[in-house]
């Protein structure tokens, strides 16, 4: 699914919550990549996932315990679900090369800057090579 959107209407939040719900409730072994102009900009995603887990009704969890969110070196892990979210920056397309991802969110892509020897499209190609075609 591709969503082209205007800024500040909530589309990114909807995408992130949908991805978080899939990972927290529906699927195991379902990894995601979130890439922004800067890696620090993807901190918003971490906050959204944390908020979703904090406020998700406990009685709706099918497992014995609600999954916890652990973070380490740009990777968020949902304990008990075998799902990860890889946070990446558009300036480093090789950072997620080889990741087995099912979900991708390219955020603020219009603001991705070209750097010496790297074009934003290099990042898009690197990320989409990580998505298995079913």
Placement of each model-derived feature along the sequence:
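Phosphate/NTP-binding elements of NTP-utilizing enzymes
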Residues: 1-134
């Amino acid at each position: 699914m591709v969503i082209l959107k205007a800024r500040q209407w909530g589309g990114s939040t909807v995408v992130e919550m949908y991805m978080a719900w899939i990972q927290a409730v529906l699927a195991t072994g379902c990894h995601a990549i979130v890439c922004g102009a800067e890696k620090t900009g993807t901190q918003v995603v971490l906050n959204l996932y944390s908020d979703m887990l904090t406020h998700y009704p406990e009685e709706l969890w099918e497992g014995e315990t609600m999954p916890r969110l652990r973070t380490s070196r740009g990777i968020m892990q949902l304990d008990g679900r075998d799902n990860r979210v890889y946070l990446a920056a558009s300036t480093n397309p090789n950072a997620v090369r080889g990741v087995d991802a099912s979900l991708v969110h390219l955020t603020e892509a219009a603001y991705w800057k070209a750097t010496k020897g790297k074009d934003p499209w290099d990042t898009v190609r690197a990320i989409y090579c990580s998505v298995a075609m079913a």
